[in-house]
Amino acid sequence: MNEPSGRVVLVPGLGLDARSSARLRERLPADVVLLPGMGLAQPVPALDVLAARLRSDLGDGPVVLVGHSQGCQVVAAAAVDPRVAAVVLLGPTTDPRMRSAAVLARRWLGTVAGEPSWQAPLVAVQWWRTGPRAMRALWRAASPDRIDHRLARVPVPVVVVRGTRDRLCPHDWAVQVCAAAPRGRLVEIPGAAHMTVQTHPDDVAALVREASRSSPRGVRRPPESP
């Protein structure tokens, strides 16, 4: 099996930690970066500070950045780094329509209904570890941020992935996110909901490998002008 050309770095979703990607990492060598609100019960700084913390963990590169759910927002903000060779966004959740609590609750319940029940204890223990305070703070920091503006400045391949049963990342929103990236591509996984990193690890691993091969090994982009 071909491995990615370069290091894979994963950023988990809201309240989640490395356990959310354990099944994926059995199939794909990858490193997980935990951040406040995403596995760490720490005060959540501004989104650009979170992105800077992620960039400090990238090493020499090239790197394939993979974000899940709210982690997509941090990945999009960090992806202008010249060490990033490709980006995979699993279920980005900053659809402006979800700033309404009623819409968010309705979509969350609809998505939960489409998830396998075996995930519930695993997700609950991760949320407990991260804590509601950090999770709320991350949502407030990330949800107003314009991911389309971020991705417009990302020249590397960007693969947007959603499950066909994911109401937190509906089809029209995923299309909009994909269109914002100069080299964006949308992939929908049939029957999956929001937790594709956990429920469909084979599909996600294949997409990460494909994204990594779409950028030549060792490519370095020049640093951006200040």
Where are these regions (language model features)?
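Conserved HGGG/HGGXW glycine-rich cap/lid loop of the alpha/beta-hydrolase fold
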Residues: 2-40
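Short alpha-helix in the alpha/beta-hydrolase fold that links the catalytic acid
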Residues: 156, 170-179
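Catalytic histidine-centered segment of alpha/beta-hydrolase-like enzymes
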Residues: 192-205
